[in-house]
């Protein structure tokens, strides 16, 4: 018991230290990486396995910590990191060839009757939530929205922090009935997938999204006034648009590709986001080449903007993701998350109190680790046995936990989606968290109330 409390205390102290130094202006990537390596080394000193189960030890706790950094560079640098770099490169290329300006010019005309940028913000948020049905990865969706919707939102008068928050938050509430989290939750609840996803989770999700959209309207309006946030609305009369009108389609090619190459629209053809973005860049280059009357030299010079955008993404976003991953592994390997689980088991509370405890612990773990999946997968294992002991409906415990893990990720300064969108928007992750905090907290309250009203407590 004493060792368990020590492990939890170490996790809390290091987490608070990370927050302190980042607030003081230290570079987040360096702080997170240092804290993660420290936690991994302390894990070895306490006698635990430093590396996750699928990795073999190097034989030394110090080199094990370095081995995990290498693993994250390969895994996130070459996986999710490559996706981010491709999308950032694509976005930079679209800006360079003038396609984003064409989009703003074209879309501003029909939307000019909407005078409030905050109504546009709500509309963008609802569109982004629908996009989560097609793109299951929170970070992938956030980066995709930053590459496509973000330039248009800021040009139409939505402040940069508010626009980043919109891109970071659509995956906070799960809508997709085929999401891996939903499938596991349905299994643990003992309900058929269609009953759990459509009849149980979906009504709660819709209520939460409506509340979060309204909260985003008022909260961002309040913060913009309070912080005197500069608006970047473009004066259309002064906007220089040299590219032809059909360039307006180009920035949306990745989004179009997600729907076209999903294996159903064109049966037999399924492409992942990496290939879709590469194809989008290729189409953009081809269109630009034809538009410039087959001036190959100029077209290839313009393409350099794509490579520069990818390089900037590695420095500003991907290394942050790597560092955040090392930090999250440090927290998990030292036992901080397992000890939170133990607290839930020994709490011995009533139905509603137990649901609140499990939900609170899931949110706390999601904020600390930056992961929406890991806390839920860990805590959901407890729900069926706890529900059986107390005669509760497992779904009553699981639905708030399911949504809480994703909501918690959206207010974590070390989560992939917050780090990635903040990096692309060139603002602090803490600014994103500030913008998403009130909508997320109200969304969580809505989920809890919705569960209590719509889901039977007892089996």
From Swiss-Prot:
Ranges annotated as spanning the membrane: 3-23, 28-48, 79-99, 118-138, 139-159, 164-184, 195-215, 243-263, 267-287, 317-337, 347-367, 437-457
GO biological process: C4-dicarboxylate transport
GO CC terms in record: plasma membrane
UniProt topology in membrane: Multi-pass membrane protein
Signal peptide: none
Localization, UniProt: Cell inner membrane
Keyword list, A-Z: Antiport, Cell inner membrane, Cell membrane, Membrane, Transmembrane, Transmembrane helix, Transport
A molecular function GO annotation: C4-dicarboxylate transmembrane transporter activity
Catalytic activities: fumarate(in) + succinate(out) = fumarate(out) + succinate(in)
Pfam families: DcuC
Family: Belongs to the DcuC/DcuD transporter (TC 2.A.61) family.
Function text: Responsible for the transport of C4-dicarboxylates during anaerobic growth. Catalyzes the uptake of fumarate coupled to the export of succinate.
Annotated PANTHER family: ANAEROBIC C4-DICARBOXYLATE TRANSPORTER DCUC-RELATED
The protein, known as: Probable anaerobic C4-dicarboxylate transporter DcuC
Organism: Vibrio cholerae serotype O1 (strain ATCC 39315 / El Tor Inaba N16961)
